[in-house]
Amino acid sequence: MSRGTMPQPGAWPGASCAETPAREAGAAARDGGKVTAGAQPRAATRCPAEHEEDMYRAADEIEKEKELLIHERGISEPRLSVAPEMDIMDYCKKEWRGNTQKATCMKKGYEEVSQKFTSIRRVRGDNYCALRATLFQAMSQLAELPPWLQDLELILLPEKLINKYTWIKQWKLGLKFDGKSEDLVEKIKESLALLRKKWVSLAAMKTAEARQTACDELFTNEEEEYSLYEAVKFLMLNRAIELYDDKEKGKEVPFFSVLLFARDTSNDPEQLLRNHLNQVGHTGGLEQVEMFLLAYAVRHSIRVYRLSKYNTEEFITVYPTDPPKDWPMVTLIAEDDRHYNIPVRVCEETSV
């Protein structure tokens, strides 16, 4: 898709590929030559066309891994959602040591990215990965506060929408809020208020170093971090409702929204919530077409180096394809279409 094409429905993760558990620790390595630490079982996507590794796991596996990590490093050490930066080619050599066709493709992809960026930050690969990588990049950039966050109506949005669309009460709160009998409207209002508060604080910082340090700290606070994801998911639902209503009224809408509501599992916003957004963070991540919706929700264009698509027109994919000129851009790296890492430190000799 690179700079002008859309991913076809058959290429979306989840459109035609069944997710099955990889019951042997070495399954991922056999699949493409990638070295995985700790021999932890993962859920793997087995697509007939590409057989790409799925970095996502079930919620209970994620919690077990967290307990193990806490036990190993001690409870006092903060959990890292976004790892410290390291040289991008050192990371590639560490992760892709094999000589399989996939490993070779990944190495060439990383070599290409290294012409633009010198370092990488690994993002924790749970079912919030796409949200985490995008939001971390957007909030850590030295830029002004986005205008949409300054809208006084933002915090009133949950009450307004839930009063109009009672089916939103089907909303499934994230992992950190399971089992809590909090009022849904109040919980989402709190999440949106937190998103605004943290972004305002970061935008007021004068140096990139100060902003980066504060953002790193924010993404080690699990309760606040997961609350931010609830806010972003609600913003995604709000944009989906707006786009669906415009489409029903015959107004011109972005092409991705036509595809979004053409799926059997998301013919309307209610189905999108029940079958897709409610699963994000629990049993699934964002599909390709939902990356467009994420971009529209936070009003940032998302440029992704899709390493598995090296040497094709889809190697660099931008969501949306033709973003408004005033939208900031975040850049991510994807080894597959589910897990995203963050490239950092632009090479001085490039303008990208």
Curated annotation (Swiss-Prot):
Keyword Glycoprotein appears in the UniProt entry:
no
**Phenotypic effect of disruption:** Embryonic lethality. Specific deletion in immune cells leads to acute systemic inflammation characterized by rapid weight loss, increased levels of pro-inflammatory cytokines in serum, neutrophilia with all the hallmarks of emergency granulopoiesis. Specific deletion in T- or B-cells generates healthy mice with no overt inflammatory phenotypes. In contrast, specific deletion in myeloid cells results in a strong inflammatory phenotype, characterized by chronic inflammation and autoimmunity, caused by sterile autoactivation of inflammatory pathways.
* A GO term for molecular function: cysteine-type deubiquitinase activity
User: In what residue span(s) does the OTU domain sit?
Assistant: 118-346
Note the Pfam families from the entry: Peptidase_C101 (PF16218)
Coiled coil start-end? 49-73
What results from changing C129 to A/S?
Answer: Abolishes deubiquitinase activity without affecting interaction with RNF31. Lethality at midgestation in knockin mice caused by inactivation of the LUBAC complex, leading to cell death mediated by TNFR1 and RIPK1
- What does the record give as the function of this protein? Deubiquitinase that specifically removes linear ('Met-1'-linked) polyubiquitin chains to substrates and acts as a regulator of angiogenesis and innate immune response. Required during angiogenesis, craniofacial and neuronal development by regulating the canonical Wnt signaling together with the LUBAC complex. Acts as a negative regulator of NF-kappa-B by regulating the activity of the LUBAC complex.
**Any idea what this protein is called?**
Ubiquitin thioesterase otulin
Supply the source organism for this entry.
Mus musculus (Mouse)
